[in-house]
Amino acid sequence: MRHRKSGSKLNRTSAHRKAMFKNMVVSLVMHKIIKTTLSKAKALRRIIEPLITRSKVDTIANRRLIFSKTRNNDVVTKLFTQISPYFYNRPGGYTRILKCGLRKGDNAPMAYIELVERSKIKQKI
C-alpha cells in the first residue's frame, strides 16, 4: 500500500526520476530559469529548495552533500559563490513557478520555474 507516501511518481521508474531531477537541478542552477511541465516544476521545487538552504553555510560536508545530489562541480561552485549570497536573509521560497499555458502536442500544462532573485544574480562570463 502507498499510504502516506509524499511526492509524485510522474510515470517513471525511480532511477529515471532521480536522473531527470538531477539534470533539472543542474539546468536550473546554470540557467536560473527553465520551462517544464507544471507537475515536474512542483516536484523540482521540493528538491532544489533544501539544496539552496544547505548552500548558505559553506562547509565541506555541505559541498559534498550537494555534489552527491547533482554530480556536477560547476553547480556546486555556482551555488556556493554566486547564488547563496542573494538568498542569505531569505528563510525559504527561493523559486517561483509561473504558468505559461498548454503544450501544443499533448495539451500538458506548462510552467516556468525560476530563481526568485534571478535578475540580481551575476552571470559569470
Swiss-Prot record:
Superkingdom in the source lineage: Bacteria
Where does the signal sequence lie?
none
The entry's keywords: Ribonucleoprotein, Ribosomal protein
Q: Which GO terms describe its biological process?
A: translation
User: Per its UniProt record, what Pfam families does this chain match?
Assistant: Ribosomal_L17
**Cellular-component GO terms for this entry:** cytosolic large ribosomal subunit
Q: Which GO terms describe its molecular function?
A: structural constituent of ribosome
Subunit annotation: Part of the 50S ribosomal subunit. Contacts protein L32.
Q: Which family does it belong to?
A: Belongs to the bacterial ribosomal protein bL17 family.
| Xref: PANTHER family | LARGE RIBOSOMAL SUBUNIT PROTEIN BL17M, RIBOSOMAL PROTEIN L17
The identity of this protein, by name, is: Large ribosomal subunit protein bL17
